[in-house]
Amino acid sequence: METKKTLREGYTTGACATAATKAALTALITGIIQTEATIYLPVGRWATFAIEACEIYGESVKATVIKDGGDDPDATHGAAIVSTVSWAEQPGIHLDGGKGVGRVTKPGLPVPVGEAAINPIPRKMIHETAREVLEQYGISRGVNVIISVPNGEEIAKKTLNARLGIIGGISILGTRGIVIPFSTSAYRASIIQAIQVAKANGCDHVVITTGGRSEKFAMRQYPHLPEEAFIEMGDFVGFTLKQCKRLGIRTVSMVGMMGKFSKVAQGIMMVHSKSAPIDFSFLAAIAEQAGASPELVAAVREANTASQVGEMMQEAGNERFFEILCDHCCLSALREVGGGMTVETSLYTMGGQLLGKAVRNDAGD
């Protein structure tokens, strides 16, 4: 019998930056090149990091850790996370971002506008670790710590940073210090952050999409909305809707395709392919309501995929089917959040043709 392989955890960019800082500061104090650094992670355990490079330049030291995403590598997997530490004229620990670490240009993020995109917990980790090293050696001098990512600007193109107003590089992130393989918490956190940025930039209408292709169609449909109003929710329909409601978004437009939106119409709010099957009897009932022939209704009931149903209804020229399906999506969304907002739904083909749309205002409309 095949045994399930245990997935290997990785480390966050914040943990890598902290380990690199510890190595660089230790080398600056002792003059000894460091090959590893052990730090305490927020998750409550110690971890030892290999130091890829440790270069001493008299009054400053540069140490590098290679980011290891474990068995769930993201865009930053394999990136060099560099900490350059030097003595400061002022007391205290002065942390900033260098080349390849983004700058915050829009409100709504946990870091103020104008500062390096080093999130609060990595900041705290770096400060505390640097303080511990200074105390260990009985040193009271101030230090400058610059975190850089040589290829950060390129890597950032594969992330949502530009949309969130983080320009020039990646963010130094991580609340736990470790990356749990295929956990959804990071994706959910990015959805919340995107809604917060939209809200902080004056958007009370956001467009939530199931992926990049849907988003492209949505941007064409809503050209008047700013870029930060568009949020990729992936499979997390219910979660995203609830966060929009919680954060005071008044109008939510959902844009997607047959496969996932057939599930939303049924009231399924987590639309991963393995989350729940599509109810073809439900789609057949909509086809009947839309005036489809008995033969077409029977064919819908026997279909294999929602896309196939979409093609059948298109060939039959039955636009009403798509309008009713979109209306069901709106009703499901309003039920999920308990009303109190306007919900629009637009349904597209894979090629970008608008099949139908609907709008519902509040729960009882």
From Swiss-Prot:
Q: What class of enzyme is it?
A: transferase
Q: Name one GO molecular function term.
A: cobalt-precorrin-5B C1-methyltransferase activity
Q: Which UniProt keywords apply?
A: Cobalamin biosynthesis, Methyltransferase, S-adenosyl-L-methionine, Transferase
Q: In which pathway does it act?
A: Cofactor biosynthesis; adenosylcobalamin biosynthesis; cob(II)yrinate a,c-diamide from sirohydrochlorin (anaerobic route): step 6/10
**Reactions it catalyzes:** Co-precorrin-5B + S-adenosyl-L-methionine = Co-precorrin-6A + S-adenosyl-L-homocysteine
Q: HAMAP family, alphabetically?
A: CbiD
Q: What is this protein called?
A: Cobalt-precorrin-5B C(1)-methyltransferase
Tell me the classification of the organism that encodes this protein: Bacteria, Bacillati, Bacillota, Bacilli, Bacillales
